[in-house]
Curated annotation (Swiss-Prot):
It is found in: Plastid, Chloroplast. This is Large ribosomal subunit protein uL14c. Binds to 23S rRNA. GO terms for molecular function: large ribosomal subunit rRNA binding; structural constituent of ribosome. Transmembrane segments: none annotated. PANTHER family: 50S/60S RIBOSOMAL PROTEIN L14/L23 (PTHR11761), LARGE RIBOSOMAL SUBUNIT PROTEIN UL14M (PTHR11761:SF3). Its main location: plastid. Part of the 50S ribosomal subunit. The keyword Plastid applies. Keywords: Chloroplast, Plastid, Ribonucleoprotein, Ribosomal protein, RNA-binding, rRNA-binding.
Length: 122
C-alpha cells in the first residue's frame, strides 16, 4: 500500500532512481495505491546527465509493493521493495527497459507495453 510521502524505487532506464509519492490519482478520497494504480510523484534521486532531473513532477505506475497482494485464487505475492515505472500522460513508459519482475495484473489496467518490456511476468 502506497500513500503520500512514500518512497519508491524506479525500475526502468528513464533516468530517475527514487521518487516520493505526493498524490494517488483517482477518486478524491482514495488514500492508498496498490499494484496497477497511477500516482503523481516527485523525483528525489536521479542519474546525472539524463533527461530526468531531481524535483521534477512525474506520473508513475506501481508494479511491486512490500505489502502482500492477494489474487482471486488465494495466492499471495509480496516483494522486497516498493517499485514503480515512470509513464507519460498517455500511459506509455518513458524508459525502454524494465528491470525485475512485474505482475500479470497490470494487463487488466491496460499497461501491456510495460508487460512486454519486462523480463519476467509473475
Amino acid at each position: 500500500m502506497i500513500q503520500s510521502q512514500t518512497y519508491l524505487n524506479i525500475v526502468d532506464n528513464s533516468g530517475a532512481r527514487k521518487i516520493m509519492c505526493i498524490r494517488v490519482v483517482g477518486a478524491s478520497y482514495q488514500r492508498y495505491a496498490h499494484i496497477g494504480n497511477v500516482i503523481i510523484a516527485v523525483i528525489k534521486e536521479a542519474v546525472p546527465n539524463t533527461k530526468m532531473e531531481e524535483s521534477e513532477i512525474v506520473r508513475a505506475v506501481i508494479i511491486r509493493t512490500s505489502k502482500e497482494f492477494q489474487r482471486d485464487d488465494g495466492m499471495r505475492i509480496r516483494s522486497d521493495d516498493n517499485a514503480a515505472i515512470i509513464i507519460d500522460q498517455k500511459g506509455n513508459p518513458k524508459g525502454t527497459r524494465v528491470f525485475g519482475p512485474v505482475l500479470q495484473e497490470l494487463r487488466q489496467y491496460n499497461f501491456t507495453k510495460i508487460i512486454s518490456l519486462a523480463p519476467e511476468v509473475l
